[in-house]
Amino acid sequence: ITGGGGQQGYASLVPEVTMSELVACGTTTVLGMLGTDGFAKELTTLYAKAKAIDDDGLSAYMLTSYYGLPTKTLMNSVADDLIFIDKVIGCKLAMSDDRSPFPTEQEILRIIHQVRLGGFTSGKGGILHIHLGALPEGIEPLLNIARHYPTLISYLSPTHLIRTEALFMQAVEFGKLGGMIDFS
């Protein structure tokens, strides 16, 4: 909702979405998040844009952090953002992508812990939305987490799971374990 891009220099930054663009395609609810750019784009701007969209009559929510590690938050932690910031419903991360921070399974578990505590304390549920690239590891760390900690799978939301055939097959397995899968 605050635009994206920037991977080819400042001139490649994508502008913010407009209200007329949202209405033209029938959108009633949006989820804003930062992607690769957790530096020139700010969570404060994302929050302000979500509030502005709400003020204009649509529903808007946001994820805290961006592709990278350590997580970036508005307050002191991912859990604090979920608990105390009305618009925050989860956290963003990237993995298996050359732009990702290559998070370990333990790092992912620590973020899930924050999302889970913040989610149930705030009554929002909480979600860890994970951008996937096409690197060979795919979602293997998420599959390991799902196998060893089945109660945590409901907090995981991997996306772009159709980049490769191998990733698609992992997604099918993840879905069979009870996980959400997204093929956008």
Language-model segments: residues:
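A glycine-rich helix N-cap at a beta->alpha junction
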Residues: A52-Y66
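Metal-associated gating/positioning segment near the N- to mid-region
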Residues: I1-A48
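Active-site-proximal loop/turn and secondary-structure-junction residues that shape catalytic pockets
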Residues: T36-G38, Y66-L69, M95-D97, A134-P136, ...
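Hydrophobic faces of well-ordered beta-strands that scaffold small-molecule active sites
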Residues: I1, V30-G32, A60-T64, K87-M95, ...
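Generic structural signal for hydrophobic
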Residues: L22, I53, A171-F174
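Active-site core of metal-dependent hydrolases
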Residues: R99, H113-S184
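Active-site mouth loops of central-metabolism enzymes
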Residues: T2-L13, L63-K72, D98-F102
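Active-site gating/metal-coordination segments in enzymes
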Residues: P70-I127, M180-D182
